[in-house]
Structures are given as C-alpha cells and as structure tokens.
Amino acid sequence: MKALILVGGYGTRLRPLTLSIPKPLADFCNKPILLHQVEALAAAGVDHVILAVSYMSQVLEKEMKAQEQKLGIRISMSHEEEPLGTAGPLALARDLLCETADPFFVLNSDVICDFPFEAMVQFHRHHGQEGSILVTKVEEPSKYGVVVCEADTGRVHRFVEKPQVFVSNKINAGVYILSPSVLRRIQLQPTSIEKEIFPVMAKEGQLYAMELQGFWMDIGQPKDFLTGMCLFLKSLRQKHPEQLCSGPGIVGNVLVDPRARIGENCSIGPNVSLGPGVVVEDGVCIRRCTVLRDAHIRSHSWLESCIVGWRCRVGQWVRMENVTVLGEDVIVNDELYLNGASVLPHKSIGESVPEPRIIM
C-alpha cells in the first residue's frame, strides 16, 4: 500500500525554525515531524511513501533516503516545479500512485495525531466508495472549515467554511484514503482537494468521514506546535510511559533524550521535551517548552512556553515566556527578559524584549 505526504510548502508559519531546515524535518518531541508520520504508516503496512517535495527538496531527500533501509520501505520523491496546491501533487504523482489498484493514503505534513491508519483502511473498504477523510471534533468550529456528515454512516454531505452559526463541530483532520479512480478528477494544475475535489465527491455520494478518537493537532505554527507537544506527551504517558523521564525535579510528562544532561536543583516540566546534546545547568526551571538538539541553558534561567532552536545558548538568570521562539544558533545574554520574541537564526540578543516582536 502507498501513501503520499504533502511536504512542498515553505513552512512560513513555523519561522524562524524553518529558515534553517524544511518544516517536515523540524524536531517534534525529539523526532522529525515527517518521521512520526512515516513510522506510523510503515507500522500500518504501508510499503511505499511518496513525498511531494519542493522547498529544500535535496535536504528532505537526503534525510529520508537514510530512513529507507531502517524502516524497510520504499521512499520516492515527486518534485513540484511550481506550487500545485493540495490536489495537484496527486496528479503529478499519478504514475507512482497507480502502480497498483490499491487505495492510498494522503497526509498533510503539519498533522500530528493518534494515526488510525489500519482502522481507516477497514472503514474505506466497508463503505466501498472513492474517498475517506479523517475528521476530528474541535471546541471552536467557527475557526475552521467544518464537515457535515451522517452520524451513523459517515457519509459526507457538505463542507462549510468557518460557519458563523453551528452546523457541525467536526473538521477535516488532513488525513485521507483514496481509491485510484479519484485521480481522474484531478488535473495537473494548482488545485485544492478540500475546496474543489471533495465537495464534488460529497455531492455524488463518494466521500465518507471517519471520526478520530485520539488527539489531533495541526502543528504548523509555534503556539500549536507547543499544544501538540502537550497532547503527544499525554498520549505517550498512556501508551508508552516507560519512554518518559522520571526522577528528582521532573514534573509531569517530560521527554528527555538520553544524550541530554540536566544539572542539580532543576524543575523540568510539566510538558517539556529536551533533545540530544541539550545541557541544562543547575537551578533551571523549564515548563511547556521544547529544547532542540545541542542547545545550552545556563544556570538559574526560567523558561515557559518556548521553543529553543538547535545550538542556542541561553545565559544565566534569563526569563523567556509567551511563545518565545529562538531560531538556530541564537545567543541570549545573561539576565535578559524575552516576552513572545521570535528571533531569527544566528542572532545575539543583548537587551530585553519586553513586548512580542520579531528580532532580525
């Protein structure tokens, strides 16, 4: 079985992290976002993953080719010369997707969830129509495009973009399984599968929705990245608690790479991820943060709701909060306060940032 993952975007919403690396390779809970998806697909029996690539495609190809042998699957690249939206890449990869008559998965690269791939295959085969989409319930459906479907069968009737009155609290979760016949509906041109293809399929009774029972988050921007981390760690606590850290100074769900080092009298957690090579000196407090590979947090600093990029250096007695994001190789000098700062790579910060802003 095959899967196509849409990884061609520029990742602008997740800057400054994506100024150094394509978004699918950004570390989420100590593993590239893309690898979370590919590993889940492989575990469900997918043996061929096609990446619809554009931005930084050579970096993506090099990294994922290294994963082919480890995972025992085939990984192919489908190169977009121009942006093709969310449906055009399927037409571009038509020859690869149609090598067999089996249905195939399509994923948005921003999605992290309890991927129910095996259940989706069963659901798709049961209803026997062209397409199945994963939907998830949200508290504020007016912020999204919602899916109106039958409660018992899942048959999709229509899509409503950002409704002002309640029609449904189920939204498109960005994970699909499609029969090859769907490709006849798609031309090789910029096309939206959500706005141009799915509504027609729904009108013809060819589209069904399966509700996700576990967690879900689109982690394409920093605040949602951190929320997704919290949900992922909660799920990890339920399924694989042995992977989480415990011991003195560890509070709640904390994921620590074995190659990270934590000093004495620290308070780490809840909801923290520390990557390989991270050094946390004595007396540091970290809450609801992800600290990426080889970053160094000096003594007595206090971090909450932050993303600390690769190889950053945070000085002593620093306070950072309110979704502060440090790009790669940023230096924050001692005794500074950063409130909602977004700092581009390779900058040295010598004064406090009391109000949210971009540091270029």
Curated annotation (Swiss-Prot):
Task: Please state how the activity of this protein is regulated.
Answer: Enzyme activity is reduced by incorporation into the GMPPA-GMPPB mannose-1-phosphate guanylyltransferase complex. Allosterically inhibited, when part of the GMPPA-GMPPB complex, by GDP-alpha-D-mannose binding to GMPPA.
- Which keywords belong to this entry? Cytoplasm, GTP-binding, Magnesium, Metal-binding, Nucleotide-binding, Nucleotidyltransferase, Transferase
GO BP annotation list: GDP-mannose biosynthetic process; protein glycosylation
Question: What residues form the membrane-spanning segments?
Answer: none
Hexapeptide repeat domain as annotated region, ranges? 245-360
UniProt: GDP-alpha-D-mannose binding residues: D110, D218
Cofactor(s), names only, from the UniProt record: Mg(2+)
- Described function: Catalytic subunit of the GMPPA-GMPPB mannose-1-phosphate guanylyltransferase complex. Catalyzes the formation of GDP-mannose, an essential precursor of glycan moieties of glycoproteins and glycolipids. Can catalyze the reverse reaction in vitro. Together with GMPPA regulates GDP-alpha-D-mannose levels.
Q: Report the protein name in the record.
A: Mannose-1-phosphate guanylyltransferase catalytic subunit beta
Q: Supply the source organism's classification.
A: Eukaryota, Metazoa, Chordata, Craniata, Vertebrata
